[in-house]
Amino acid sequence: YPDRSAEKLATQPNMATSSSMIGTNVAYETGYTGAGTRIAVIDTGIDTDHQSFDNGAFDYALQQEANGNENYIKSLDLLDQSKVTAVLSQLNIAQNGVSADDLYYGSKLPFAYNYVDKNTDVTHDNDTQSEHGSHVAGIAAANKYVPQTDGDETTYVSALDTVKTQGVAPEAQLLVMKVFGSNGGAFDSDYMAAIEDAIVLGADSINLSLGSSYPGPSKYTAYMDADTDPVPVYQAILD
């Protein structure tokens, strides 16, 4: 047989061009960066320590946009502990005895909850459900800047220039709703509860990259109820 061996080349992931391919450069030039919006990602959770979701870098980006305008950030109506506290009793998770402080991971991730395990561990560390949630969250809203530390000093540098990755809406906040965990998933009762909570929390869009062999009519009812709020609901259907 002929020698069919091939050299394995090193892969260099590069998402730097993906946003411009869908026209986001035009949106950015007109001021649409996602600032003041909330994206709910119902998935496997998130890497809370990842540089793309750094709270300091998120705050820095908003300060750059403000450009000295003291009212700019206030006008964004960012989700914070006080706003979560105000609606906590309306959330499905209220019965589990959590507080807004428990759910708050910072300005970039102001709400994060594990619906399947009924706790606030939304990382990928304690189950085998993959890091898919971080991937999805990054595509949607990975920060415009990433932290760079030199000794005791932290500065923020362009994410596109340094790590070749930036989300479509880099200045949006993320609502992390983990529906895959150590107890399995995703169960209808969990992601439907997450959809309802996302609406209460003021999500501007809801993403579910989920799939099943036969989706029952009840989930479509939940989606339609969400869409009439109106909140766009996006689901990736996988075979």
Question: Where are the regions that the model predicts?
Answer:
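Short, intrinsically disordered, charge-balanced linker/junction segments flanking boundaries
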Residues: 1-6, 115, 234-239
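Active-site-proximal loop/turn and secondary-structure-junction residues that shape catalytic pockets
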Residues: 6, 138, 212-214
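Acidic glycine-/aspartate-rich tracts in secreted/extracellular proteins
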Residues: 3-5, 44-48, 143-146, 180-182, ...
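Structural recognition of the beta-strand scaffold that forms the well-ordered cores
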Residues: 38-42, 52, 108-112, 138-139, ...
